[in-house]
């Protein structure tokens, strides 16, 4: 009892001065050595299939350390933690997000760019960064990333859809509609895997923008047969910068699963499904007449290997979809190394 095996140690961190005192009080005044054991973490590899809630997973140890730091010690403690995490892009993404949460915007950008460099130009890493910028409401930066991806991969209709959504969130409604229409018009010869599904998503979301801001838009060049609305209470889509997901399920307030057999209906114009595009996952559902209460989003996650690129889910919820009073809600969820049937998000109607 009390013995420590080297095989049970995940990392060793040496803390000095304020960082050690912040964790251990007077006992840490002369410094401290922190041994991180191998245990279940939000971002620790696991290959045992199970059902669980993401919110119940413990945070990484470095997040527990940084969260007790005072503002004037934040950067110093970050630099100490970096010594044992410098090769992990996910560390920089986590730290950047927390610095932004603490209103340390300049440092957050600097840290995030370090994480982007570790992704080595990988398109999925760039999408992870764009998701982070969206979360921070820095839509211009997200737009620039999506435009760069689309220039390098013109057939990547998934990134074009991301660009259209970013324009919409930034209030550039005409550019949003134009981009959606570009997806819809994409040449038949450019079909790659599930391009047709992305065209259908583009029709849905283009009409959502038009239904809300028609008076501000020039839609004269759009085929009028494509301008139509089928309003629903909720339109939900979940996508990732990774492909290791399947089987999105939505549990209603009474615990009933969203299927085509009950009062819920599949997303307008296409059946409920999940599909992959350029190594990314996306899935969606619509609910025509939503019952009041709590909804739970569950998904099968297979990301049990450690990758250099951080893995995120982005949950897009349109309330009063394709109606003049519709509201867009977006959730960004870190999903590194999750494996199992995971409840990733909840929302109320």
Task: Identify the role of each PLM range.
Residues 54-56, 85-92, 119-126, 155-160, ...:
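Generic helix N-cap/helix-start motif at coil->alpha-helix transitions
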Residues 1-48:
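Short, small/polar-rich motifs associated with maturation and membrane association
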Residues 98-99, 133, 167, 210:
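Residue at a conserved register position within TPR or TPR-like alpha-solenoid repeats
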Residues 151, 168, 172-192, 203-210:
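TPR/TPR-like (Sel1-like) alpha-helical repeat modules
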Residues 209-349:
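Intrinsic-disorder/low-complexity signal
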